[in-house]
A protein has these predicted regions:
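Beta-strand cores of modular interaction/reader domains in eukaryotic scaffold and signaling proteins
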Residues: 176, 187, 204-206
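Core residues of folded domains in eukaryotic genome-function proteins
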Residues: 171-173, 179-184, 201
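A short beta-strand element within beta-rich, extracytoplasmic domains
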Residues: 181-195
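Disordered, acidic Ser/Thr/Pro-rich linker "stalks" and the adjacent N-terminal cap
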Residues: 1-48, 53-176, 197
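Trp- and acidic/polar-enriched beta-sheet ligand-binding modules for extracellular glycan
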Residues: 155, 167-170, 193-216
Length: 216
């Protein structure tokens, strides 16, 4: 059995393309994506990978706690939070490889993941979710908080996608790593589309260890 595989399926589950490898996978798909198409990344649970499932997305260092992560190609409103060139055209290069030990041990942005979606829950990390996302729009989804885009001088469509709380005083964002991690720095980049953004007054950060211990 190979260590990594990437496959593309249509809305009915028909296999459109696939490739696998022990260390690295490069999958070329020479067709336009259609609504309902999905990409599935398969790896041994516990693997650290560097993935780039579209050549527009920035490569992401991820931890696979589960074996299969399936993301649906965004169309319509779901596409507005992405660079318009993402998943476009009639030829695509999807890449994944095992991370080197030095990459695993190096100091890095532990939160960054340009490939995060709701379906990553319990499978592919880092993963983020929230208890409130304004009107359920992709441009205000929690995943935008960790997609690596730091442009914050407006809001709505890319490049101004963000996490929006709809003025909820009890809004919470949860960032999961899928494992215990060490950190020495926390950086928050608030949206600064004034006077639209004048709601935040303070924030409370709670760290939760694997054993459930909390530190505020």
């Amino acid at each position: 059995m190979s260590n990594i595989a990437i496959s593309i399926q249509d809305k009915n589950g028909k296999l459109l393309a696939t490739d696998n490898g022990n260390y690295r996978v490069n999958l070329v798909y020479a067709a336009k994506y259609k609504k309902g198409d999905t990409i599935t990344l398969t790896a041994k649970p516990g693997s650290f990978l560097v993935i780039q499932l579209d050549d527009v997305l920035e490569p992401s260092f991820v931890y696979m706690k589960g074996a299969n992560y399936t993301m649906t190609i965004p169309f319509g409103e779901d596409r507005l939070a992405y660079n318009p060139k993402t998943f476009s055209g009639d030829v695509h290069l999807l890449k994944a490889r095992l991370a080197e030990q030095c990459e695993i041990e190096s100091r890095k942005n532990l939160a960054f993941n340009s490939h995060d979606t709701a379906s990553a829950k319990d499978v592919c990390f880092p993963h983020v979710f929230a208890n409130n996302e304004t009107v359920g729009m992709s441009v205000f989804a929690a995943r935008n908080a960790i997609d690596g885009n730091t442009e914050n001088r407006s809001h709505c469509n890319w490049p101004y996608e963000s996490w929006d709380i709809n003025s909820d005083p009890n809004a919470e964002l949860t960032l999961e790593f899928g494992r215990a991690v060490k950190m020495d720095k926390l950086v928050l980049i608030p949206r600064a589309d004034f006077p639209h953004d004048n709601y935040w007054q303070q924030v409370t950060v709670t760290f939760i260890a694997p054993d459930g211990t909390e530190r505020i």
